[in-house]
Structure formats: C-alpha cells, structure tokens
Amino acid sequence: MKVLAAMSGGVDSSVAAARMVDAGHDVVGVHLALSTAPGALRTGSRGCCSKEDASDARRVADVLGIPFYVWDFAERFKEDVIDDFVSSYARGETPNPCIRCNQRIKFSALYAKALALGFDVVVTGHYARLSEGRLRRAVDQDKDQSYVLAVLTAEQLRHAMFPIGDTPKPQIREEASRRGLAVADKPDSHDICFIPSGNTQTFLGERIGVRRGTVVDAAGAVLATHDGVHGFTIGQRKGLGIPGPGPDGRPRYVTAIDAETGTVRVGDVADLQVHALTGRAPIFTAGTAPTGPLECAVQVRAHGETTSAVAELVGDELSVRLHSPLRGVARGQTLVLYRPDPDGDEVLGSATITATSACSPVS
C-alpha cells in the first residue's frame, strides 16, 4: 500500500510512520510548512510546525530510510485556520483551531493532494482508532484525540490510518527510544501553534482592532466598558474589568456575548448551566444520518467531560437534549456524539454549536 505519512516532527507521528514502514508499506514522509514568516509559528522543543520541527521530521525520515518532502500549505492554513479563528472570535464564538486544521488542512488539502498523487492512505500520529471504518477513542484516554477528528467524513476516514491509537503514550516514547529516534523525549506541544506569544487576546486584538462595547449584569446595568468581545468567552471569570463580585458576594462569570451590540453579560455560575444544544453543519462519521432520536454521549471540549443525551437531526441542524447539564458551553465549540462502548467509545458525528438553552433536562 502506498502511504503518505504526515510528519510533524514530534514523537507520535514519527512512531506512526515507523510502524507503517515495519508493516511493509511504501511510505513517503511529508511535513507541512504552514507559515512563510519567520517566527510566526511557535518555535523550539514545545513547538508545532516550526522550522525546528521540519528538521526533526527530516532526521526521523532519514533514520527510517523513507523519502521526505516539505509541502507549502501556508496560504491555505492562513485562510482556513487562522482567519477562521479570528473571525469566529469577532463573532463572539469560541472555536477550536486544531479541529479546523484537521478538517481543512490535514484531511482536506493534504488528503486531496495525496489521493491525486496516487497514495492510498494518509497516516498521522493522532491518538484514535479505526475499527471497520468506525472512529473510536484511543486506548490512552488521557491522550485521546477522537474529539478533534470527529469532523471527518466516512470517505476521509476510509483513506486514513492512526497507527498509534492502540498504544499508551509512555510506550510510544519507549518505542521511539528503542528505534533510535532523536524525538523520543521531545515534549508535547499544548499551545496554539500560530500564536508565538501564547497570548490569544493580544493576537486577536492586533487583527480585529478596538470594537468598544459594554459589560452588563443580568438586569442590563452597565458595569464596565471593553475593547472588543474577542477578549471574552463563555464561563470566563477573570479579566472582566468589573469592580468585583456581585451584590451577593458571589463571583461573576461571562454568561452571554452579543457581537452585534458589543454586549458582554455576566452573571452567577448557575447561569452557565445548559441542557440543550443546537449545532450546524452536522457530520456523521459513519456516513449516514440518524433517522430518529439517538441516545448517545456528548462532549464539547477536547478533553472535557461527557454527558448522556438524546440527539436528533431537525432539518439541517442537530438538536441535542442533555440528561444532565454541561457548564459554560459557547457558540463556535464543536459538539461530538459518542456511542459508549467498553472496547472504545465510537464517534457518531459532530456539529458546530450555534445556540444553547437552559431548558429542562431530558427525563
């Protein structure tokens, strides 16, 4: 089988590529260049997609004895990931750029180029499993990345492989060390790769500018002014620019954001509880949409809690009623549906959250 191994320069994608070589496949390594501006991406051992990472990936490819290339996806990355991230925050949403990168770069732009060049599959170092075409959680629950892959279609999954999903991370590092890969002890990256400073608010402010608005309480009384809704997210408690806690002495949290009026509302923690979600552009990873109400589990953050729910396709939107509430859910987040399974929860689909509601939970 002709395999294109996406090599980030980290230990996970390196071992994934090595396993495909061991399996006897015709493997070619590729690293994605995502920025043309030096210093625009995070650099160093904790980086992602930096020049250092490209060099690390090339050295691993040399050890494995496979061809290696660097493909320039900088413009596509800027348009489909960075610009999308900025515009989402400007709309008062809270997006996940890693999900957009998987959806629009790794398994869209890269995927299309790979198939056009005659490759059978794209291999990555994601912690997830594929079983008979079904996407499942990884064995290592702490590293599971099925959430950020839940935007992939059945067709994309047919041409994808995740070779390390059945192995805990410590064993991956041990394997890399045994193979003599210099990245065996390379730290994981945790931050957004295109924000070198790690300061998301400053990054957004430089691109969106000042769009003044007000911070109000539940009754509509103005508590403070602000320079833009991009500086806030649902559930935020610190950095609100307000004098202190509410009249009852309890902390106040961001409970609603209206980008059109520039209004940020704050309230009690109880106001963050939601029992219903609405999502747009649903994707069902098995390829078929449910024909009626679907009992499932829902997750709204990459490593967040799950709660049981009933999901149903209503027109072109996904309607989800939760059995127990989730706290601090924002528009722009991705909701992912799972089917609980002792052998590894199966991903059923996903959608981008457009609305939340505090209506009564499903009984």
Swiss-Prot record:
ATP binds at residues 6-13, 32, 125. Its EC number is 2.8.1.13. One of its GO terms (biological process) is tRNA wobble position uridine thiolation. It holds the Pfam family tRNA_Me_trans. Keywords: ATP-binding, Cytoplasm, Disulfide bond, Nucleotide-binding, RNA-binding, Transferase, tRNA processing, tRNA-binding. It is found in: Cytoplasm. The active site is at residues 101, 193. The record marks 126, 333 as: Interaction with tRNA. Disulfide bonds join 101-193. GO terms for cellular component: cytoplasm. It comes from the Bacteria. PANTHER family: MITOCHONDRIAL TRNA-SPECIFIC 2-THIOURIDYLASE 1, TRNA 5-METHYLAMINOMETHYL-2-THIOURIDYLATE -METHYLTRANSFERASE. Belongs to the MnmA/TRMU family. This is tRNA-specific 2-thiouridylase MnmA. It comes from Mycobacterium marinum (strain ATCC BAA-535 / M).
